Amino acid sequence: MNSISLPLDRNCQVIDYHPAGVWALNKATGVLSHPNEPNAKSPCILSSHFDVEEECYHCMDEKGKTHKIYLIHRLDSATSGILLLASNFALSAQLKNAFSKREVEKTYFSIVEYNGKPIRPYWKDFLQKKSIAGKIRVQCGRTGLMALTEVSLERKNYTKYGLLALL
């Protein structure tokens, strides 16, 4: 049984919990996966201490015992979606490894202006890391890592918007 009550940001929700100690959270737009800097004021998924070295939050259970809650992967602040956390270090390491080896399939959805023309079945571009105002940002460029992503138009309305899936 899960006796750890996660101190969630008010805009985030637990979608599911597995008894092995894995949480699936719905992370809202504008909420950080973890604090970028010590003493930062930006809202994070959990309002508890984050250990940068161990990549985990420190949360208390109902009896006052501190537990480490490991962040499995990250989502950018501007991205909403499912975020995984684990209370078991070995399991968190296995899951992180699966993400780093790209064994986990992810789909990103984007609402776009749609002009009715056919959509290319892929997006291909070079991505470059740049420092802008002291923050690392990724943007399209002439050099860098090649990004190749499948694209499909999932839904088109009779308005100017459509829903794209980036696989």
Q: Language model features by range: what are they?
A:
Residues M1-L167:
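RNA pseudouridine synthases
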